[in-house]
Amino acid sequence: MRILIVSGAGGGTSKKSVGKYFHLKDFGDALRKYNVDYKLVNELDYFIGFPTKSLRKYFSSKKKLNKLISEFEPDAVLVDRQSNFGLEIIKRGIPLFVLLRGHYWSEIEYAKNTIYKGKIMRKIVDIRADVAEQVFAGSTEILPICKYLKDVVKEHHPTQKSNVFIEGVDDKKWYKTEGMKLKHPCVGMLQDANWWRKTKEMLTLEKV
């Protein structure tokens, strides 16, 4: 069996981020223990959907994607974001599994009410949201990373199959830094704060 794993990290606030890529590689390596072959690729290296500023890459995308699919011949595809790449996989009739790491629908709502208030940007958000809904609806299965998100998926796509994907974190890959001098008792919080609304909650700590 062959599984194509596609990492969508690398755009927006996660530009040059490798964290999610490492997690997907670990998953792929684990699959090999069960005689499953995998290929891990960066989504933007093979396909860019519309709207985009990279028109040259957009027009050459389908050719690159066709070559990738024809050479690797995947039995299934796992993507970690809801984009045109996933939509193209659905159109080709290949089973698609969508990894969902956050409350996508809340993110869209918050984005339109804060940083994307202009008519043009709101339209772009709407177009991408429409693509995402098609990906969710047409996927073989949605894989939220926790039970809470599974309930959220059921609210938006009640008939779609979903199961919790326990990703886990390998702390051996963390960068070492000098410790902080803390006054005990204290509480530590670790957060991947690359989404604006999530960082807002940290302001609560100023009052604690």
What are these language model-derived features?
Residues 1-44, 207:
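N-terminal subdomain of nucleotide-sugar transferases
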Residues 4, 143, 180-200, 205-206:
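Conserved donor-binding/catalytic core segment of Leloir-type glycosyltransferases
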Residues 34, 92, 201-208:
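Short hydrophobic signal-anchor/transmembrane segments that target glycosyltransferases
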Residues 47-51, 98-130:
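Acceptor-binding helix/loop patch of EC 2.4 sugar-transfer enzymes
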Residues 63, 67, 119-142, 156:
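Membrane-proximal helix-turn-helix segments that form the acceptor-binding/catalytic region
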Residues 67-84, 89:
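Short N-terminal targeting/anchoring amphipathic segment
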Residues 150-169:
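Helix-loop-beta element that forms the nucleotide-linked donor phosphate-binding surface
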Residues 168-184:
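Acidic anion/phosphate-binding donor-loop and adjacent secondary structure
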